Design a protein with these regions (language model features):
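Extended alpha-helical targeting/anchoring segments
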Residues: 1-495
Length: 495
């Protein structure tokens, strides 16, 4: 069944929408997201998958996949570039905030939110880096060494989406019809759906190279250097510059092959609220993030601060003891409260007056290797602002920077002296109807050329023990480094 009908699509066109999502449903019980992703990679290497598991045991309603982006928006050191589906530069500019450029692209793609359709029916998929902050805070100098060379922003525009409905075992093929000539646009959408169906049923799977680590992981800071950095941060806390700062450490290794199998293992061993794989022009990313940066749905904003960490116990009894220890740790509770307040302040920048509130306060969130204290903050988006404004207000999250945020970012720039890039930024989507869902870019492996990186951080407060914070970075990175190491053996186990 095709929805909407042509006559219904014409009505949406009359309402001023530039695009209308057209959907076709089919059974998905003999198709898996991973097998389909392999077919999409055979068609076009620039593709993505977005998945979700709630409470480590319940799959989210939808899994989204896309391939062959129509446009690619990138920003590097203030230079904004728009490329078409063939990689040809069609526009390049500088001297403006990236959000202006992004809005300019999206203004021709406004679409309706149709009842009963998946939450994402087309839009931008990709990332905003941690360093995106510099475009909003003009006085902030982020001049750390850039050893990785990743974009500040990389957003691919997809007007075709494949959605798994994990509740109804349905596959939903979505193509967006342009309304400039709605009859012609509708027929093209039907043709796009036909081609997607053919690819799903009869397409060949890509021969994807397995990951092979050629070296062991090398840290940016060894234990001694990281501990010195913590002591310097504590000095700034004693001097009154900041209350808290998040200091990260990076692991780097040489590798051959793809992160595809690493993603397969991550989704199995570390099921998380945000699981994603995407392959762009200059970056390949596999991740399983526990934490929302900001979510905008029909004008309602949410952010979910996670702060306070313990490793998981080997037994249920040990796990509960570690939970009690965490909830009784004054240092961890103080850190969490600071970051809840920062989340409220961030949402307050873009929310209607009086609408910001803490919905859920201090509950334990468990993941494969660690547990965290989590809270939920919500607000109502101001009518004169949009989802991109929300990213601008919240990024980077306080849980990846510190408090006060701007001074903490200055200290991170000084002490780490290494551009964070995608780590600590935002990964997710902005859809054509104005909604947004982004997670914090943590628990990720990301690759450029023959180098793969894993980064993690620890929140530093006045009574932090440097060696403990170094160990916390290791604990947080372990789910990803284990997945990278063990994914080298998947093919042999499946033979």
């Amino acid at each position: 069944m095709i929805r909407p009908t042509l006559s219904e699509a014409k009505e949406y066109a009359k309402q001023g929408y530039h695009m209308v999502p057209v959907c076709y449903e089919m059974l998905s019980d003999i198709i898996t997201p991973i097998n389909l992703l392999k077919k999409l990679k055979a068609e076009n290497e620039h593709c993505y998958i977005l998945e979700s598991v709630e409470n480590q045991e319940l799959w989210g309603r939808y899994t989204f996949l896309g391939y062959s982006p129509k446009l690619d928006i990138t920003c590097m050191n203030g230079t904004l570039t728009l490329k078409d589906e063939n990689g040809t530069v069609i526009k390049e500019t500088s001297g403006i905030h990236p959000e202006i450029f992004i809005r300019e692209v999206l203004k021709d793609y406004k679409s309706p939110k149709i009842e009963g359709f998946p939450t994402f029916t087309g839009g931008l998929v990709g990332y905003f880096s941690y360093d995106y902050l510099k475009y909003s805070e003009k006085k902030l100098v982020l001049d750390a060494k850039d050893e990785e060379g990743f974009q500040d922003v990389d957003l691919m525009l997809f007007d075709k989406v494949i959605a798994f409905d994990n509740v109804r075992s349905k596959l939903i093929l979505i193509a967006n019809a342009g309304t400039a000539n709605i009859e012609e646009g509708y027929q093209k959408a039907l043709q796009d759906i036909k081609e997607m169906k053919e690819l799903i049923l009869h397409g060949a799977e890509a021969d994807i190279a397995a990951p092979v680590l050629k070296t062991e992981f090398k840290p940016l800071f060894d234990k001694e250097a990281y501990c010195r950095m913590v002591e310097k941060a504590k000095h700034y806390i004693y001097e009154g510059d900041i209350f808290q700062v998040v200091l990260s450490n990076r692991l780097e290794a040489e590798m051959e092959g793809s992160l595809f199998d690493t993603y397969r293992l991550l989704r199995s061993t570390n099921p998380s609220p945000y699981m994603f794989y995407f392959d762009g022009d200059t970056i390949e990313v596999a991740g399983a993030s526990p934490e929302t940066l900001v979510k905008v749905e029909d004008g309602v904003l949410h952010t979910f601060p996670l702060a306070g960490t313990r490793p998981r116990g080997k037994t249920k009894v040990e796990d509960l003891e570690l939970e009690k220890s965490l909830m009784a740790d004054e240092k961890e509770l103080a850190e969490h409260n600071m970051l809840v307040d920062l989340g409220r302040n961030d949402l307050g920048k873009v929310s209607q007056f009086g609408t910001v509130e803490v919905e859920r306060y201090m509950s334990i969130q468990r993941y494969s290797h660690v547990m965290h204290i989590g809270s939920t903050v919500r607000g109502t988006l101001r009518e004169d602002l949009d989802a991109i404004s929300a990213v601008d207000a919240v990024l980077p999250a306080g849980t990846l920077s510190g408090a006060p945020k701007i001074r903490a970012c200055e200290i991170i720039n000084e002490l780490e002296n290494n551009k964070r890039g995608i780590y600590g930024g935002a990964i997710g989507y902005i859809d054509f109807s104005g909604n947004l869902d982004t997670c914090i870019a943590i628990r990720i492996a990301y690759r450029k050329g023959n180098k793969v990186f894993v980064r993690s951080g620890a929140g530093i407060v006045a009574d932090s023990v440097p060696a403990n914070e170094f160990q916390e970075c290791i604990n947080k990175a372990k789910a990803v480094t284990d997945a990278l190491i063990n994914s080298q053996k998947i093919r042999g186990d499946e033979a």
